[in-house]
């Protein structure tokens, strides 16, 4: 008996008129949309994002010492694993003064990782690191870094994440610092800096 009542309860539906129903008044009725015919001879409009004036083709003129380097979460973790001092290794790679920058999203991501990554958190809170405030919603660090780099072309992105590297390679004029063979390397740098590749 109880089972029948339940099924009857779910089976009852609120019956509503369709917006195309003839019983509705003319003004309330939904009119069928007519498809516009496309003219094949018309020129197609394309939206191309305007590139900043600091770019000369792929060469970014805003990059210069002291270098501002946006650091990702996994870059700090892998640097600790490789026993590298972040600031000193960056200077060895670029032969110039480097200012590591860390966004609120990256900081929140490191804090979420918990007790296991407390060394990374201590390094991220180093006074030599610049703290960049985030105004957007959410704390997904990859989106935050990509958005910041797209807006301002004065940063180098330090990451080991393949997906993030792939996304940043699509943005012209942004170099990527990564870790290989226990040293930092840099790709897409306008001047030929970087540790030698073996």
UniProtKB/Swiss-Prot annotation:
Function text: Part of the small subunit (SSU) processome, first precursor of the small eukaryotic ribosomal subunit. During the assembly of the SSU processome in the nucleolus, many ribosome biogenesis factors, an RNA chaperone and ribosomal proteins associate with the nascent pre-rRNA and work in concert to generate RNA folding, modifications, rearrangements and cleavage as well as targeted degradation of pre-ribosomal RNA by the RNA exosome.
What GO cellular component is one of the record's annotations?
nucleolus
Under which name does UniProt file this protein?
rRNA-processing protein FCF1 homolog
Q: Which InterPro entries match?
A: Fcf1/Utp23, Fcf1_PIN, PIN-like_dom_sf, PIN_dom
The keyword RNA-binding is annotated on this UniProt entry: no
**All copies of domain PINc, residue ranges:** 67-166
| GO terms for biological process, alphabetical | endonucleolytic cleavage in 5'-ETS of tricistronic rRNA transcript (SSU-rRNA, 5.8S rRNA, LSU-rRNA); endonucleolytic cleavage in ITS1 to separate SSU-rRNA from 5.8S rRNA and LSU-rRNA from tricistronic rRNA transcript (SSU-rRNA, 5.8S rRNA, LSU-rRNA); ribosomal small subunit biogenesis
Which residue ranges are recorded for the region named Disordered?
22-47
Which locations, inside or outside the cell, does it occupy? Nucleus, Nucleolus
Give the UniProt keywords, A-Z: Nucleus, Ribosome biogenesis, rRNA processing
